[in-house]
């Protein structure tokens, strides 16, 4: 089950939904107002949750509730600032920083010291260590290697626009990340510029900079090694 259609308050029976969901239009996250269907799917209300929370984990509910699904493990040193929802059977790695507005689906793995802010992470996605994922969507079964970065702010301080099959959309958002399609695989230190879309089943080699929307395919940098000193 995809979380994003519920968060957009979209008509799930619509016959002509946009090719790419307008992920920037989702409503502010209020955990106790999620639909019962979502709560059941994320196993937020089961009687025996068996959640494992290690020592020195900080759960800060000053700005909103933090709700965690069954059989999820939160490792040593992680910081979670509500409002946040984490589904069932997830692993939140050591010193991960989960910031407000984030909702994480079932079976997600978050690596060491990764920071996630105001993002939707769909089911069975894997996000490696030391990544920064902000104002973005990571679709189901996507894999992000270490130190992947989603840029969410233009240096000229202009609102972020998104190029879609329907045309260029002025989102009005000062901060907006990207949409990473399902089953995409991103190598170490990939950087995605604001408002970009990576199509499903796309593979990006290490250190690729995503400057434009990418259709499904395999992409890599061409490297030239020059030996000197002989």
Swiss-Prot record:
InterPro entries found in the cross-reference section: GlmU-like, Hexapep, Trimer_LpxA-like_sf
Gene3D superfamilies tied to this protein: Hexapeptide repeat proteins
Molecular function GO labels: acyltransferase activity; nucleotidyltransferase activity
Broad enzyme group: transferase
Keyword tags: Acyltransferase, Repeat, Transferase
EC number(s) stated in the UniProt entry for this protein: 2.3.1.-
Keyword Aminoacyl-tRNA synthetase recorded: no
One Pfam family this sequence matches: Hexapep
Family membership noted in the UniProt record: Belongs to the transferase hexapeptide repeat family.
Name by which UniProt lists this protein: Putative uncharacterized acetyltransferase YaiX
Organism: Escherichia coli (strain K12)
């Amino acid at each position: 089950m995809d979380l994003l259609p519920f968060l957009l308050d979209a008509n799930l029976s619509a016959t002509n939904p946009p090719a790419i969901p307008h992920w920037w239009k989702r409503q502010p996250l209020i955990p106790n107002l999620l639909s019962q269907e979502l709560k059941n799917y994320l196993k937020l209300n089961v009687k025996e949750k068996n959640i494992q929370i290690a020592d020195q984990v900080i759960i800060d509910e000053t700005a909103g509730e933090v709700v965690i699904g069954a059989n999820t493990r939160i490792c040593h040193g992680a910081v979670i600032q509500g409002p946040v929802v984490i589904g069932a059977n997830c692993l939140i790695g050591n010193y991960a920083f989960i910031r407000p507005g984030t909702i994480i689906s079932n079976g997600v793995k978050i690596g060491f010291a990764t920071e996630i802010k105001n993002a939707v992470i769909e089911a069975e996605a894997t996000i490696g260590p030391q990544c920064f994922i902000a104002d973005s969507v990571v679709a189901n079964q996507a894999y992000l290697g270490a130190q992947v970065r989603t840029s969410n702010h233009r240096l000229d301080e202009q609102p972020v626009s998104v190029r879609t099959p329907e045309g260029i959309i002025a989102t009005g958002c000062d901060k907006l990340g990207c949409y990473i399609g399902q089953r995409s695989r991103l190598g170490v230190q990939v950087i995605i510029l604001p408002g970009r879309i990576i199509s499903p089943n796309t593979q990006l080699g290490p250190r690729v900079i995503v400057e434009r929307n990418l259709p499904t395919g395999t992409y890599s940098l061409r490297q030239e090694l020059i030996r000197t000193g002989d």
